[in-house]
């Protein structure tokens, strides 16, 4: 794993590169995933739950940028589309000509303070199946893939395991992937999340 840091105007970027089978990289930067860097078609991937809940975590920031992903997800969860609403499915929502959001169902239910789950809501195989759909979409359109640390926030997943899935399903197939950490404290290590307690607050 190689580390480099630089200042790029809008963001302080802390970049780590993990070599995939193709020699391409999974890139980490400090920035806002709802406003991906670069040009050309951009696909923003995030993880949703399978009960139709949209109201905590990353989706709140996403809805401030555009309500389209939220509105499409709610129609989907209400059975108003032909696509099955189930783990491993992905809904592609066109926000603008160059920006699409992938609502990937990779979480079963949600964690609640008054009803702890027997295991974290994350479902790794659902994320893997969803990323295969993401791969097909991005390869067809020649786009870049962007995401927060999917499945490792409220879903309670282990990022090391999820990172391996991303490398296998996206990077190893020649897709450029950027992972965003939204961190304000300079020098904090974004790759060392606190997993001391479950469920998350």
Locate predicted features.
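Macrodomain-like recognition of ADP-ribose-binding/processing modules
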Residues: 2-201
């Amino acid at each position: 794993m190689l580390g480099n840091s630089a200042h790029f105007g809008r963001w302080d970027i802390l970049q780590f590169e993990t070599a995939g089978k193709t020699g391409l990289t999974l890139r980490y930067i400090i920035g806002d995933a709802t406003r991906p860097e670069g040009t050309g078609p951009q696909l923003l991937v995030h993880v949703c739950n399978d009960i139709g809940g949209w109201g905590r975590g990353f989706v709140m920031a996403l809805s401030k940028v555009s309500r389209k992903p939220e509105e499409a997800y709610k129609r989907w969860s209400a059975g108003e589309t032909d696509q099955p609403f189930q783990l491993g499915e992905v809904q592609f929502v066109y926000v603008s000509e160059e920006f699409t959001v992938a609502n990937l169902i990779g979480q079963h239910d949600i964690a609640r303070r008054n009803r702890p789950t027997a295991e974290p809501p994350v479902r790794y195989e659902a994320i893997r199946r969803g990323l295969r759909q993401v791969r097909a979409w991005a390869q067809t359109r020649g786009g870049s893939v962007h995401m927060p640390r999917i499945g490792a926030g409220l879903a309670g997943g282990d990022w090391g395991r999820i990172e391996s899935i991303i490398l296998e399903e996206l990077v190893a197939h020649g897709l450029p992937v950027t992972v965003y950490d939204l961190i304000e404290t300079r020098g904090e290590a974004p790759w060392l999340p606190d997993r001391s307690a479950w469920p998350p607050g």
